Amino acid sequence: MSAILTDRQAEELHKAIIAYLGVINAPKTAEAFREEANVSANFDDATRKKYEGLLEKKWTSVVRLQKKVMELEQRNQTLQSELDSTTPTSLLRRNQDPASWLPRAPARHTLQSHRSPITCVAFHPVFSSLASGSEDTTIKIWDWELGELERTVKGHTKGVLDVDFGGPRGGTLLASCSSDLTIKLWDPSDEYKNIRTLPGHDHSVSAIRFVPSGAAGSPSSGNLLVSASRDKTLRIWDVTTGYCVKTIRGHADWVRDVAPSFDGRWLLSAGNDQTARLWDASSGEPKCTFIGHEHVVECVTIAPPVSYANLASLAGLKKPPPLSSSAEYIATGSRDKTIKIWDGRGTLIKTLTGHDNWIRSLVFHPGGKYLLSASDDKTIRCWDLTQEGRCVKTVTDAHGHFVSCMRWAPNVIKDVPVNGDATNGATNGLSKKKEEEAAKAGIRCVIATGCVDLNVRIFAS
């Protein structure tokens, strides 16, 4: 008797073997085995039918389990590799430190309702609301914490190309732009009623952003909106009046994206002319042109001050710029499959390669250590600015098709103001420490992505 099986298990196995030998038409072998195994002689047809197929089922179950074990072992190796490539040595510390959090599959929520590809997403600055825009002409408002659709906003007659929340303090608005040549403003506090339509562009409006307010020299009190268009221009709008207050010309082709600096003093744009351009938001005058990409520049982003120390080190500088300064470093993503990091004077610092298709969106980690990218190769990649821009994580199964957009949820609290004019080293050090502590305290570890596969996904800790 086997030491592994109980008497009952051994009897069940023997009967299953006899039934199997009967199925394969080996009666002599079955009879010989019955005698050798001391199986009772009353192994009738009813008993045989009971055990027929049992051995095959057990065998295939074992094969399936072996396959599953191999898959889990492979997954374990992948996770271990990710673990080893991450800088913090303590798993507990990594889980508790928002400044080191990176997205991972699977997504917390997959939001489905759009009928055409997703083009854009945007987080409400206070509430757990997320807006998504689509080629189906609609905007959908979701509760990203619950993963539920709250409402569908209709008004555009062609595809929605970008959305953004912002506006004067205490009066958050949602702005959207479209291939129908218009920008629309919606009031979240009044069931997303369309309160204003801004015509003026002569072609599709590709991107919009509210211009932040509050900094010395900022042209905005929270009521300005900047738009980029296929008509080769940028326009600045006053959302309280609906008037276009400035038109900025300089690009030679379609302007694909625009991003304001955190203090609203600078605007960064890029497009089909394969350049990115930095503009003074007050005067509309160009400050710098970034030349180096070999194809359309799809997306741009301006580095937050919390990343200055890491980017200055990447640039070979001993001392970072003051935290009060803006547009010191930028990043651009292109159809040439590369990401380029520049300083604010147009000097190329680093080219990041690894994506296999167009770069569609860039986001600096609010902790200042990473740059994240989304691409038509269906992945999200995380680049470590403290490791020479090395790709330390790839979310390979982020979506099932081109990842068209990505946004990071805004911080819970505002950054602590710092005195950028201080020249004393200790004072600057204290300011930097306060800045980092405030940034960490406010980081929400939540990312939203949109895709051609009609899905919006929420990646969260």
From Swiss-Prot:
InterPro entries: Dynein_regulator_LIS1, G-protein_beta_WD-40_rep, LIS1_N, LisH, PAC1-like_LisH-like_dom, WD40/YVTN_repeat-like_dom_sf, WD40_repeat_CS, WD40_repeat_dom_sf. SUPFAM superfamilies: Lissencephaly-1 protein (Lis-1, PAF-AH alpha) N-terminal domain, WD40 repeat-like. Residues 79-93 have a biased composition (Polar residues). The keyword Cytoplasm applies. GO terms for biological process: cell division; establishment of mitotic spindle orientation; microtubule sliding. WD repeats lie at residues 113-154, 156-196, 200-247, 250-289, 292-352, 354-393, 398-444, 446-461. One of its GO terms (cellular component) is spindle pole. The keyword Secreted does not apply. SMART domains: WD40 (SM00320). Residues 60-87 form a coiled coil. It holds the Pfam family LisH_PAC1. Residues 79-98 are annotated as: Disordered. GO terms for molecular function: dynein complex binding. PANTHER family: TRANSCRIPTION INITIATION FACTOR TFIID, TRANSCRIPTION INITIATION FACTOR TFIID SUBUNIT 5. Self-associates. Interacts with ndl1 and dynein. HAMAP family: lis1. This is Nuclear distribution protein PAC1. The lineage of its organism: Eukaryota, Fungi, Dikarya, Ascomycota, Pezizomycotina. The gene is pac1.
